[in-house]
């Protein structure tokens, strides 16, 4: 049907959701993607829930007017506080959120120490509390990392500045974490810096691949998969040439 050629919209507080977009494109290269990053208001993770809901609502309103066929909320903070509102407002629409990949982490390490590094809003949210309750584990450490998003937004994901930032955040956990859940879509871009601090023995988990698989499943069930040609369009509230250059770079970069 004609609607199957409409865009899959992917939204984030900035460029972090590109880590999810990469997984979507890898899994469904023939689809058409519209990525919107709200870098002018980043980070969401240090704002109030009310602010995040308002900004997410405004973004989705604009995108719905474009005739999109599905919405991927590729922002852990926006998913944590706004996904319920979006699903109530658009009950018949395909809306996929992202959540920290806690389930695979606790399944892999049922008796070992697992960390969840995320924004303060995500760590405080009821959605994460429910996720932890659904995946009981004897030793989960919550690790807030306010400031990490800003470094990724500045193009410093793999830099001495990122190392200096992460050292006090993750330093106390060196040799103590078997698994670390990356609870913000910006964080996978800092994988190299995280490994420099924690080493290679700590297994990193992020929810991008699972989100892409769920999106494919929902589109397939609805008969909305597209057979190409695929494309990716970037839009950003900052509307600055440097941010679009960063988007293209993050799409291509090997950050592992």
Positions of PLM-derived features:
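Non-catalytic structural scaffold of enzyme domains
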Residues: 1-256
């Amino acid at each position: 049907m004609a609607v199957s050629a409409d865009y899959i919209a992917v939204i984030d507080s900035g460029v972090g959701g590109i880590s999810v977009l990469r997984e979507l494109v890898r899994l469904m290269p023939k689809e058409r993607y519209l990525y919107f990053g709200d870098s002018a208001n980043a980070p969401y993770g240090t704002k109030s829930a009310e602010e995040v809901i308002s900004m997410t609502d405004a973004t989705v309103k604009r995108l719905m007017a474009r005739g999109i066929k599905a919405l991927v909320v590729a922002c852990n903070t926006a998913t944590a506080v706004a996904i319920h509102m979006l699903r109530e407002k658009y009950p018949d629409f395909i809306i996929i959120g992202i959540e920290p990949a806690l389930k695979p982490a606790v399944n892999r390490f049922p008796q070992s120490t697992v960390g969840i590094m995320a924004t303060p809003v995500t760590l405080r949210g009821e959605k994460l509390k429910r996720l932890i309750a659904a995946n009981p584990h004897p030793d989960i450490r919550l690790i807030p990392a306010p400031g990490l998003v800003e470094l990724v937004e500045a193009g410093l994901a793999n830099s001495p500045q990122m190392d200096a930032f992460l050292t006090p955040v993750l330093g106390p956990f060196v040799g103590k974490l078997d698994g670390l859940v990356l609870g913000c879509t910006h964080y996978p871009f800092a994988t190299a810096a995280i490994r420099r601090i924690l080493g290679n023995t700590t297994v990193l988990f992020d929810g991008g691949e699972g989100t892409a698989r769920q999106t494919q499943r929902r589109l397939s069930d609805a008969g909305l998969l597209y057979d190409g040609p695929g494309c990716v369009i970037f839009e950003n509230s900052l509307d600055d040439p440097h941010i679009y250059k960063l988007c293209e770079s993050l799409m291509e970069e090997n950050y592992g």
